[in-house]
Every structure is written in structure tokens, then in C-alpha cells.
């Protein structure tokens, strides 16, 4: 589709590899510009406290799907939000052996659950958390409603309250 052949693809990959030392400074500039514009930024798959700290220094205050407890604790300890995938909860763990969302939730280190690649998972995750007794229903539902709204700064939604944007879904316990 790009109209290139294997030789030009290889040349492009080699050129990008040769410029890899430019990446940190480019990220610094990009993050500074986005922060100046008020854009919420998140890191993905943080593995270490040090790596999480580098992102935080750039103004990146959301840690999405940290891969280790160390990275999640570093984010939480610095006041950054930790977001995990609802499918991780539904499956009972990470699909690739990384950190379990259930573990972070039980430690109070997860601020929000995201649908990730499977839109039915937030509802299922909240209900599973409540049924398991790990959280009460209100606490479990907050991870898929008010939690995501808060971490994204969406103060006009996330709770059922006068003047706020909201959708309401009625769930039948029997089904």
C-alpha cells in the first residue's frame, strides 16, 4: 500500500535506527508542547520506577497498563493515576504474563479500568469485582465510571448527579 519495496523499507528502518539517539529530546519537546496545551498524557507499559519517573518528568501523569508492581507503585506514590485494562480483570490476569489488575486493585493502586480492546469488559469487570467481594458494587463501578472521568479531568461526567452528562444502564441481576 505504501508503494515501497523491501529495499526501501529496510533503508527506512536503518535510517530510523541511526537516529534513535534523537528520540529522548524529541519526546521532551513534544511532551512540553502538549502539556502547554493542556493535553493529558499517558505512558504505556511502564516497567520500572525509573522509567515511570522519566515520563512523569515530562508531565505525563497517567500510567496506562504498567507491567510491574514497581512501576505502578512509583506512579501512585507520585500522585499519578494508574489505569489498567478491564479485560485483565475479566481474565483474572494479564494475557501476556504482566501485572495483574486484580493485584493492583486489591492494593488500592488502580484508579480506573479501561475497555482496552474489548468494550463489554468494563461492565463485566465491575460486576466480577463486586461478586468476588474484592470491592463493593459502588467501588467496583467507580473504576469504570467516575475513576476514568477523574483521571481524564472530565468533571462534567462520571457520576449520576444534577447537571452532569450521564448515561444510565439498568442491569438485571438474573441475566
What is the role of each PLM region?
Residues 78-88, 92-173:
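His/Asp/Glu-enriched, well-ordered alpha-helical/loop segment
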Residues 1-82, 94-109:
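Histidine/acidic residue-rich metal-binding segments in metalloenzymes
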